[in-house]
Amino acid sequence: MNQLNALKQFTTIVADTSDIESICKYKPQDATTNPSLILKAVSSSVNKRFIDQAIEYARKKGGSYNYKIVNASDKILVDLGVEILKHIPGYISSEVDARLSFNKEKCILKAKKIIDMYEEKGISRNRVLIKLAATWECIKAAEELKKNNIACNLTLLFSFAQARACAESNVFLISPFVGRIYDWYLSQNLILKNPADQDPGVLSVCKIYDFYKKYNYKTIIMGASFRNVQQILSLSGCDRLTISPVLLKELESSNKELNRKLCPPTSFLNPPVPLTEAEFRWEHNQDEMAVQKLSEGIRNFGKDQLSLEKIFSKLI
């Protein structure tokens, strides 16, 4: 049995791509997208029909020039998601504009709009996860959205404080970024390249997993942003792992033995008192890496969203 199929025995595999061919090949349960992947998809001639559909939709909706651009951007996000859902049995994760990451109310409105657009295409909200950056505002938005049966995927998660706040707000799923944590420690010369069991990104997810399972939190942990197969193998047994096509191929090509690394306990403890907003901000602020990477991630996803809108600005 190859490592990909072995991993599927105790971890749900999610494809970190909007490429339909890769999704069909590796047969993941779910798929995730982000502004960078959407921008990449839009840049491919294969997806020209989605661009045309988005422009037509925006023109029909009318409104100001800027309003049309926003509607076109939302439409292509949803249409690509609908197409991906034809090839997977589970969830598609679609991301809210990162520029809204510090505005709870606007995140809620955008999330509801995206869900409405999916439902207009006949897709149940039970198959869509709304991706939000794991800021305090977005965590609280996700908590409120869940009351409307809208499940969220809290992304750009780098600190233990973020993970704890998500669990305490009962969000559906988190995406701790293994590779980006590793990148930061490597860039600071704080670790050796490929440190195996001492990989700080892997250790971060292990700590979150142990905390969640010890206190029986229901939030799903989906490790993300992998740089190599060893990081993935070190997290075998994690609830979910979202993996790029390149690393899915590498796993499929290997028949080496794979052992489960993460296992849930058989008994639980009563959870601690939830963090207040002030406690969350202080604890997160104590983690230099997390502060830098969250800020950088929001900025970069914001830039990609702006690039997508610039493409539509020339076509509408």
UniProtKB/Swiss-Prot annotation:
Pfam families from the xrefs?
Answer: TAL_FSA (PF00923)
Keywords from UniProt, A to Z, are:
Cytoplasm, Pentose shunt, Schiff base, Transferase
- In what pathway does it function? Carbohydrate degradation; pentose phosphate pathway; D-glyceraldehyde 3-phosphate and beta-D-fructose 6-phosphate from D-ribose 5-phosphate and D-xylulose 5-phosphate (non-oxidative stage): step 2/3
Q: What class of enzyme is it?
A: transferase
What subcellular locations does the record give? Cytoplasm
Where do the catalytic residues lie? 131 (schiff-base intermediate with substrate)
Q: PROSITE patterns in the record, alphabetically?
A: TRANSALDOLASE_1, TRANSALDOLASE_2
Reactions accelerated catalytically: D-sedoheptulose 7-phosphate + D-glyceraldehyde 3-phosphate = D-erythrose 4-phosphate + beta-D-fructose 6-phosphate
- Any one GO BP annotation for this protein: pentose-phosphate shunt
Record has Transferase as a keyword: yes
Q: Which GO terms describe its cellular component?
A: cytosol
Write down the InterPro entries for this protein, in alphabetical order.
Aldolase_TIM, TAL/FSA, Transaldolase_1, Transaldolase_AS
Q: Where are the transmembrane segments?
A: none
Iron-sulfur is among the record's keywords: no
Q: Which GO terms describe its molecular function?
A: transaldolase activity
Instruction: Write the Enzyme Commission number(s) for this entry.
Output: 2.2.1.2
Q: What task does this protein carry out? A: Transaldolase is important for the balance of metabolites in the pentose-phosphate pathway.
Recorded family membership: Belongs to the transaldolase family. Type 1 subfamily.
Q: How does it assemble?
A: Homodimer.
Name of the featured protein: Transaldolase
